[in-house]
Amino acid sequence: MRALMAFIVVLSTCGSALAFDAFQATGIDRRAGATLPLDLAFQDESGRPTTLRQAGHGKPIVLAPVVHRCPNICGLTLAGLAQTAAGQKFVAGRDFTIVAFGIDPREGPADARQSLDKLRQSFPSLRHGILGFTGTERDIKSITDRLGYRYGWDDDLQQYAHIAAVAVLTPDGRLSRWLYGIAPDPVDLRLALTEAGNGKIGTWGDQLLLLCYHYDPQTGRYGSLIWTALRIGGAITVVAAGGLIGLAILRERRRLQRDAP
């Protein structure tokens, strides 16, 4: 995961001077459970004032920090997220909302609209399931600081360096999980939404499935507890079998030594 994130940071800062350290400026600090101010005022891509609370409609939010005019990875990140959303059972706009959260305070609704229009053409199912936010530097930082999401401005390239990741928020604005990379795994997104939904979305089957997985904050992925248990059990079995075989060989050698003339 660190290698992937490093690759993404390099894409965002390719050609920058040594004075700017993208690896020092960017990152995600672990702040699971942090509460976001849901009522800060932003603008959506149509120029209407809105808030994260209004965007969520009481459902989980998948928040993707982006630069709407980003020439590098942001378009790929949103396209990857859209593809991931289409590959799992929950429906954007019905079960959850995607917020393309602009981190550049110089951008406005027109920038968000331009980037989302292209996305909606490729993914018509997201037409009502994704919003593009822009806002003031103070309000943007209020959200990113609570999330522990760090990014930096490169004076030479005149653009932001940042990491490709999405934050999954609970309906009441708590940070539930981070999913890393340009295109999260659909199973990971489904599990993260189930967990963040607190029973408000999904079925009992989804809740039971969640019991079979655990979240690894190092990788931003969910792993199967059953598969992990099987691997541990298999390793224990191999060690135990090896010990029994070794003990049997030792006993046989001792018997042969006693029986020798």
Feature map (PLM): residue ranges:
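Structural microenvironment flanking redox-active thiols in thiol-disulfide oxidoreductases
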Residues: 78-140
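Short active-site neighborhood of thiol/selenol oxidoreductases, capturing the structured segment around
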Residues: 51-81, 98-99
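Positively charged n-region of N-terminal signal peptides that target proteins for export
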Residues: 1-4
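Juxtamembrane/start-of-transmembrane alpha-helix segments at the extracytoplasmic/lumenal side
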Residues: 216-239
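Extracytoplasmic/lumenal ectodomains and periplasmic regions of secretory and membrane proteins
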Residues: 153-212
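N-terminal signal peptide c-region/cleavage motif recognized by signal peptidases
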Residues: 14-16
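Juxtamembrane interface at the cytosolic side of transmembrane helices
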Residues: 240-261
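N-terminal "domain-start" segment that seeds a small globular fold
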Residues: 20-54, 76-83
